[in-house]
Amino acid sequence: MSRHSRRMRILCLCATTLLMAGSALASEAGGHADGQLKDFLYRLLDFGITFGALYFLLRGPLKRALSARRQRVAEALEQARQMQASAERRFAACRQQLADADAQIAQLTADLKAESALQCQRIEEQARKMADDIRSEATRSAAREIEAARKQLHQEAVRLAMELAEQRLKQQIAPQDQARLVDEYLRKTGE
């Protein structure tokens, strides 16, 4: 508060006190009829002075208090607007994320289907390759078995042919031919 303002307040307070004292003195006039009007005017004057003094004294603080209150209300409203705007932005972001999530789910589903189809194709290719390998191995194994069976049949045929030839030779060779063949063999081996 400034010095001038303080002096004015003190001056108003003193004037109010004097006027109130004047009203108190004026109200002691006895029961005259015109005293009521005078009393009413003093009271009206007293009220006006009191109201004026209060207005003068309280105008500044009341104005500051109301101004501060108005400022707080304005700040609270601004803060509420900011909070509402922030909430609306978050809501819009959440809505966008939800929309994006639907799109991402659709994309993931499509990717998984494509990956699944690719995986199935790889598995089919591997199965075909394994089947081809098994067929190839079976063919080689069968060829080996057939070759082994041919050799065995050939050996058996040779053995049977030799037995048959031996039996025929035994039937056709006489003991003297046998002695002659042995002698020829010994001569050939001895040389």
Swiss-Prot record:
Q: Where in the cell is it found?
A: Cell inner membrane
Primary location recorded for the protein, binned into one broad class: membrane
Q: Which UniProt keywords apply?
A: ATP synthesis, Cell inner membrane, Cell membrane, CF(0), Hydrogen ion transport, Ion transport, Membrane, Transmembrane, Transmembrane helix, Transport
**One short Pfam family name for this protein?**
ATP-synt_B
GO cellular component terms given for this protein: plasma membrane; proton-transporting ATP synthase complex
Record's keyword annotation contains Transmembrane: yes
Q: Which domain of life is it from?
A: Bacteria
Give the transmembrane ranges.
Answer: 7-25
For membrane topology, the record states: Single-pass membrane protein
Query: Any idea which GO molecular function terms this record carries?
Result: proton-transporting ATP synthase activity, rotational mechanism; proton-transporting ATPase activity, rotational mechanism
Family membership, please give it: Belongs to the ATPase B chain family.
What's the stated role of this polypeptide? F(1)F(0) ATP synthase produces ATP from ADP in the presence of a proton or sodium gradient. F-type ATPases consist of two structural domains, F(1) containing the extramembraneous catalytic core and F(0) containing the membrane proton channel, linked together by a central stalk and a peripheral stalk. During catalysis, ATP synthesis in the catalytic domain of F(1) is coupled via a rotary mechanism of the central stalk subunits to proton translocation. Component of the F(0) channel, it forms part of the peripheral stalk, linking F(1) to F(0).
SUBUNIT field: F-type ATPases have 2 components, F(1) - the catalytic core - and F(0) - the membrane proton channel. F(1) has five subunits: alpha(3), beta(3), gamma(1), delta(1), epsilon(1). F(0) has three main subunits: a(1), b(2) and c(10-14). The alpha and beta chains form an alternating ring which encloses part of the gamma chain. F(1) is attached to F(0) by a central stalk formed by the gamma and epsilon chains, while a peripheral stalk is formed by the delta and b chains.
Q: What is this protein called?
A: ATP synthase subunit b 1
Please name the source species. Answer: Syntrophotalea carbinolica (strain DSM 2380 / NBRC 103641 / GraBd1)
